[in-house]
């Protein structure tokens, strides 16, 4: 039978509930438990797919093609789980489902209300996603007291009552700020946050108190007194240099022991040796490289969260500190390639629309002509193909129909049709809704024998996640290959271009997929490890 941990947050947003939950999940998994993690988001969007990265950060794509919250990326990086569409439940999705049922007459003429119809649907999502796990950890987005989150809070309160206290646990994250003028930590915000939580019927079993310094025992006792949480369950959530230290931080304070005792479990002790090796590799690198990331969302680096982490994971594998130099593509176009001076590799990540495209084209040209390692992801592949067509093939008007619908040289064009992972034919055109109309999820690709990408993967098949609408136009493929660009990967039906390389270049690869979504700190990812290794080789040659 699955047992449930519900994680809520109070005082302020952005306390790191996702990281905290994932870190606890990693410890519990190390104790031999099967863990799954679920995110409940109170916004009305059906999914974050059409939200601006400046509003929401990265859209994390699951194996089955759901566009989800970036916290699911944390879950998959910390815990050995494969998230699905049911592991991220938004208010918009819940309301849409309930309204659709009402229109079909499923409620048999009843008045449809928040309680029980909305709250029951939320609970159904939780129970469905939790199947097969020993412990399901459920993070509720937002802050206690937000009007948007009330249906979700009520849903988990009801579920806790139905399942019983022995099978449910509530963990609340709060902030304990240090007031420099007074020279002390203040516990009052935490007291009031728990009071708000208790007013809706939820008594927390554990508090994780975010602070920039250790919380003294007398302050923990004070928090315990006013919140009805045992002092030993008041945990210091200290800020750390890197997030992969957090499992050890929590284990030292006995967080996992509190969970195991609460649920009455008899399991082995956690061995976090692998996590300790990760932290040691981060803290004691033997080398250092600088990678330029050229994009248009660089002022909010969470827009590239999984890519950032994948590069850091590759650094771990290469015993290398990876410094990411974020370069705004519009600045690059206006100020020139001096912004790329001294970098050891260049990556152009995914994106949509035509803003900043010219700067990305300039970055690709610089990498190609200066023989600097280049990795293009999704849009980064398309940019590389257009740049090659313009400056090598001499097709000066080469463009994407995403940037110019009337272009007479559509090197990149709309994906009109493909077969999805379920074997169903998907069709798209420009008149369709934006939301949920991309080529999404993990899709297999065949790699050309002897290609660099096949060597890196150690296989002639790869299966990475996608999120795009546009593809390389098949009418230009022969000309591209004749000029020196190799199409080294195609979708399993040999239809769509998945990977391109320039064999004459030291390391130049573009992928239509998003391999960053499957990189983990413990396992890394072969593509990014090879990319950072190439950056090291280039640096050695550049400095010699």
Curated annotation (Swiss-Prot):
Pathway: Pyrimidine metabolism; CTP biosynthesis via de novo pathway; CTP from UDP: step 2/2. Its EC number is 6.3.4.2. Coiled coil: none annotated. CTP binds at residues 13, 146-148, 186-191, 222. Mg(2+) binds at residues 71, 139. One of its GO terms (cellular component) is cytosol. One of its GO terms (molecular function) is CTP synthase activity. The keyword Mitochondrion does not apply. L-glutamine binds at residues 351, 379-382, 402, 469. It comes from the Bacteria. UTP binds at residues 13, 186-191, 222. Residues 290-541 form the Glutamine amidotransferase type-1 domain. Keywords: ATP-binding, Glutamine amidotransferase, Ligase, Magnesium, Metal-binding, Nucleotide-binding, Pyrimidine biosynthesis. It is an enzyme of class 6 (ligase). The active site is at 378 (nucleophile), 514, 516. Residues 1-265 are annotated as: Amidoligase domain. ATP binds at residues 14-19, 71. It catalyses: UTP + L-glutamine + ATP + H2O = CTP + L-glutamate + ADP + phosphate + 2 H(+); L-glutamine + H2O = L-glutamate + NH4(+); UTP + NH4(+) + ATP = CTP + ADP + phosphate + 2 H(+). Allosterically activated by GTP, when glutamine is the substrate; GTP has no effect on the reaction when ammonia is the substrate. The allosteric effector GTP functions by stabilizing the protein conformation that binds the tetrahedral intermediate(s) formed during glutamine hydrolysis. Inhibited by the product CTP, via allosteric rather than competitive inhibition. PANTHER family: CTP SYNTHASE, CTP SYNTHASE-RELATED. Homotetramer. Belongs to the CTP synthase family. Catalyzes the ATP-dependent amination of UTP to CTP with either L-glutamine or ammonia as the source of nitrogen. Regulates intracellular CTP levels through interactions with the four ribonucleotide triphosphates. CTPSs have evolved a hybrid strategy for distinguishing between UTP and CTP. The overlapping regions of the product feedback inhibitory and substrate sites recognize a common feature in both compounds, the triphosphate moiety. To differentiate isosteric substrate and product pyrimidine rings, an additional pocket far from the expected kinase/ligase catalytic site, specifically recognizes the cytosine and ribose portions of the product inhibitor. This is CTP synthase. It comes from Dichelobacter nodosus (strain VCS1703A).
């Amino acid at each position: 039978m699955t047992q449930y941990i519900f994680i809520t947050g109070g005082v302020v947003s952005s306390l790191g509930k996702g990281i905290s939950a994932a870190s606890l999940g990693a410890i519990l998994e190390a104790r031999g438990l099967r863990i799954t993690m679920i995110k409940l988001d109170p916004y009305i969007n059906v999914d974050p797919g059409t939200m601006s990265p400046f509003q929401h950060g990265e859209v994390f794509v699951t194996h089955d093609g759901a566009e989800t919250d970036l916290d699911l990326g944390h879950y998959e990086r910390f815990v050995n789980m494969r998230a699905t569409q049911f592991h991220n439940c938004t208010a918009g999705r819940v309301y849409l489902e309930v309204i659709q049922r009402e229109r079909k007459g499923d409620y048999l003429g009843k008045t449809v209300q928040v309680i029980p119809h909305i709250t029951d649907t939320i609970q159904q999502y939780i129970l469905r996603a939790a199947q097969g796990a020993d412990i399901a950890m459920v993070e509720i987005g937002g802050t206690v007291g937000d009007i948007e989150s009330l249906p979700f809070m009520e849903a988990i309160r009801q579920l806790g009552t139905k399942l019983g206290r022995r099978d449910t646990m509530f963990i609340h994250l709060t902030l304990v700020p240090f007031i420099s003028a007074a020279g002390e930590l203040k516990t009052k915000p935490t007291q009031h946050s728990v009071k708000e939580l208790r007013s809706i019927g939820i008594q927390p079993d554990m508090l994780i108190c975010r602070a920039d310094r250790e919380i003294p025992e007398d302050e923990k006792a004070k928090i315990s007194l006013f919140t009805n949480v045992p002092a030993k369950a008041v945990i210091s959530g200290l800020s750390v240099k890197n997030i992969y230290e957090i499992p050890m931080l929590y284990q030292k304070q006995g967080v996992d022991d509190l969970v195991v005792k609460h649920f009455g479990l008899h399991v082995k002790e956690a061995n976090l040796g692998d996590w300790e090796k990760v932290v040691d590799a981060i803290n004691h690198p033997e080398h250092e490289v600088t990678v330029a990331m050229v994009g248009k969302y660089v002022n909010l680096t969470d827009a590239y969260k999984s890519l950032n982490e994948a590069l850091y994971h590759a650094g771990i594998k290469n015993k290398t500190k990876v410094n990411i130099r974020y370069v705004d593509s519009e600045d690059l176009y206006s100020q020139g390639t001096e912004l790329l001076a001294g970098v050891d590799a260049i990556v152009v990540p995914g994106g949509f629309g035509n803003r900043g495209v010219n700067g990305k084209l300039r970055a690709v040209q610089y990498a190609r002509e200066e023989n600097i390692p280049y990795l293009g992801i999704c849009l980064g592949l398309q940019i590389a193909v257009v740049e090659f067509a313009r400056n090598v093939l001499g097709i000066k008007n080469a463009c994407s129909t995403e940037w110019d619908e009337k272009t007479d040289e559509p090197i990149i064009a709309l994906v009109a049709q493909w077969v999805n992972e379920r074997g169903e034919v998907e069709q798209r055109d420009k008149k369709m809704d934006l939301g949920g109309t991309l080529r999404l999820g993990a899709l297999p690709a065949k790699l050309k024998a002897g290609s660099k990408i096949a060597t890196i993967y150690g296989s002639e098949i790869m299966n990475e996640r996608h999120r795009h609408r546009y593809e390389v136009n098949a009418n230009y493929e022969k000309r591209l290959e004749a000029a020196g660009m190799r199409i080294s990967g195609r979708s399993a039906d040999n239809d769509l271009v998945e990977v391109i390389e320039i064999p004459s270049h030291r390391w130049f690869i573009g992928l239509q997929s998003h391999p960053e979504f499957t990189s983990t700190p413990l396992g890394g990812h072969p593509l990014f490890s090879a990319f950072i290794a190439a950056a090291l080789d280039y640096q050695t040659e550049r400095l010699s």
